[in-house]
Amino acid sequence: MTLSKAKAFWQLTRMNRPIGSLLLLWPTLWALFLAADGIPDWHVLIVFILGVVFMRSAGCVINDFADRKVDGHVKRTANRPLPSGLVSSKEALILFSVLVTCSFILVLTMNTLTIMLSSIGVLLAIAYPFMKRITYLPQFVLGLAFSWAIPMAYAAESNQVPPEAWLLFVINAVWTIAYDTQYAMVDRDDDLNIGIKSTAILFGRFDKLMIGLLQLTVLTLLIALGIQLSLPSLYNWGVLAAAGCFVYQQWLIKGREREACFEAFLNNNYVGGFIFVAISASVLI
């Protein structure tokens, strides 16, 4: 394998852009630390961290495979490995299969319930990129895909998926829809020209309002989670910090400029981090 080919594979898996892995990792850590009362099993923790990296990379590969014929017409994606010809469709599918296989080998070390749940996660990862041609709600499917590690984490730690896990699942799914709508705002003009659907297009001139309502829902459900689990007041400071991030994001997207919308999307890494610190500190007290 040449250096240029290796670099193309690296770019195809987005290893050079870890924001997606972080946005997938944070809710996974929320779930692991809550399910384990602050001290997850080290083996489970390692498996899920590696699983996040492998499956996020696999999701990027299958996404670019699905978009290979349209990415060349979008300014932001025209130079990606598949539309530029640096990686063939066959090579992309082989890489996707390798990444999914690695993830499956990892999950085989977990209990039966976790293994069963993992199959749904793979289907969601495959389905998402193709939803952009079918529905204006592909972000809803992404929300499910990016949240599926939550019930898996609970299953791995406790061999059950309690109601709190599904509340956390909904919180993360709604948050994902909000931040991926910001991401979709970056490409909205290009997507309209090539027929790609998104919530950014669906919401239209109400995009900022809808993102705000989604963010308000996230904060409300986070407070409800804290009440349900009797988390200390320290937890609320994390929720308040997340609220501050959401206010900042609303300021960024006010003019709907591409760079500002992308910066708002990136800012969600801090939201995930603040909530993780709040959860982990609260359950360890």
UniProtKB/Swiss-Prot annotation:
Alphabetical GO biological process terms: ubiquinone biosynthetic process
Classification via Gene3D superfamilies: UbiA prenyltransferase (1.20.120.1780)
Topology of this chain in the membrane: Multi-pass membrane protein
EC class: transferase
Any one of the GO CC terms: plasma membrane
Alphabetized GO MF terms: 4-hydroxybenzoate polyprenyltransferase activity
Required co-factors: Mg(2+)
EC nos: 2.5.1.39
InterPro entries for the chain: HB_polyprenyltransferase-like (IPR006370), Prenyltransferase (IPR039653), UbiA_prenyltransferase (IPR000537), UbiA_sf (IPR044878)
UniProt subcellular location: Cell inner membrane
Pfam hit, one: UbiA
Pathway in which this enzyme or protein is active: Cofactor biosynthesis; ubiquinone biosynthesis
Keyword list, A-Z: Cell inner membrane, Cell membrane, Magnesium, Membrane, Transferase, Transmembrane, Transmembrane helix, Ubiquinone biosynthesis
Catalytic activities: all-trans-octaprenyl diphosphate + 4-hydroxybenzoate = 4-hydroxy-3-(all-trans-octaprenyl)benzoate + diphosphate
TM regions (residue ranges): 33-53, 93-113, 134-154, 166-186, 209-229, 233-253, 265-285
Described function: Catalyzes the prenylation of para-hydroxybenzoate (PHB) with an all-trans polyprenyl group. Mediates the second step in the final reaction sequence of ubiquinone-8 (UQ-8) biosynthesis, which is the condensation of the polyisoprenoid side chain with PHB, generating the first membrane-bound Q intermediate 3-octaprenyl-4-hydroxybenzoate.
Database matches in HAMAP family: UbiA
Family, similarity comment: Belongs to the UbiA prenyltransferase family.
Protein known as: 4-hydroxybenzoate octaprenyltransferase
Organism: Aliivibrio salmonicida (strain LFI1238) (Vibrio salmonicida (strain LFI1238))
Encoding gene, per UniProt annotation: ubiA
